[in-house]
UniProtKB/Swiss-Prot annotation:
HAMAP family membership: ATP_synth_a_bact
Role this protein plays: Key component of the proton channel; it plays a direct role in the translocation of protons across the membrane.
Species of origin: Lepidium virginicum
NCBIfam families registered for this protein in UniProt: ATP_synt_6_or_A
Gene field: atpI
Keyword field contains Transmembrane: yes
KW Thylakoid (keyword) present: yes
GO cellular component: chloroplast thylakoid membrane; plasma membrane; proton-transporting ATP synthase complex
CDD domains: ATP-synt_Fo_a_6
Name of the protein this chain belongs to: ATP synthase subunit a, chloroplastic
Family to which this protein belongs: Belongs to the ATPase A chain family.
Superkingdom of the source species: Eukaryota
GO molecular function: proton-transporting ATP synthase activity, rotational mechanism
Main location class: plastid
Length: 249
């Protein structure tokens, strides 16, 4: 028992700590208290948030009875997000529109910022700026938020009866059903991170090999796939929330 206890303590103190320290690429750090944070991720995330907040201010400023072109655009975006939420969640989609919309818009603008904004012009002491979703920490954080959201949705709708889904349709599936809830955020985070990182790497390689014409179509393809990835993430998040409220599917 002592050996087993020591092994578990070693895994918790060393193994999990090492796993949490896995990094991709070089990073510029800020020291905040006793923690090191990835400064470039915070910088680019703040830029994306500023763009979204500025757009929101423009959207609600001086609304017209006869919508202008800009107002039409923002209303179209809102209707699109509402349709995605309603399709995946069902009749009780209303309270979840802000959450799904925030996920979609943050990921969409983050992905596009990696292709459209000249991050490389800004020099850092170490590492370089890139899209926030190009960092595994961002995508994991978004996936964990989604996990918290669908657990909250299920518990608020069904109370402790929510956990009965783990033994449906048979208690034999209990380990698999529990494992499924852990794999959902992993699949969300790694899918988004992998696609955005791969897209930026392909563009960088092509620019280094053929700097003029060839990378342009790839960049346009990257813009398209970036939008698709944002839609997939938001759609799956809404589907998970809807599933937790409706029951085991």
């Amino acid at each position: 028992m002592n050996v087993l206890s020591c092994s578990i303590n070693t895994l918790i103190k060393e193994g999990l700590y090492e796993i949490s320290g896995v990094e991709v690429g070089q990073h510029f750090y800020w020291q905040i208290g006793g923690f090191q944070v990835h400064a470039q991720v915070l910088i680019t995330s703040w830029v994306v948030i500023a763009i979204l907040l500025g757009s929101a201010v423009l959207a609600i400023r001086n609304p017209q009875t006869i919508p202008t072109d800009g107002q039409n655009f923002f209303e179209f975006v809102l209707e699109f997000i509402r349709d995605v939420s309603q399709t995946q969640i069902g009749e009780e989609y209303g309270p979840w529109v802000p959450f799904i919309g925030t996920l979609f818009l943050f990921i969409f603008v983050s992905n596009w910022s990696g292709a459209l904004l000249p991050w490389k012009i800004i020099q850092l002491p170490q590492g370089e700026l890139a899209a926030p979703t190009n960092d595994i920490n961002t995508t994991v954080a978004l996936a964990l938020l989604t996990s918290v959201a669908y657990f909250y949705a299920g518990l608020s709708k069904k109370g402790l009866g929510y956990f009965s889904k783990y033994i449906q349709p048979t208690p034999i599936l209990l380990p698999i059903n529990i494992l499924e809830d852990f794999t959902k955020p992993l699949s969300l985070s790694f899918r988004l991170f992998g696609n955005i990182l791969a897209d930026e790497l392909v563009v960088v390689v092509l620019v280094s090999l053929v700097p003029l014409v060839v990378p342009i179509p790839v960049m346009f393809l990257g813009l398209f796939t970036s939008g698709i990835q944002a839609l997939i993430f938001a759609t799956l998040a809404a589907a998970y929330i809807g599933e937790s409220m409706e029951g085991h599917h």
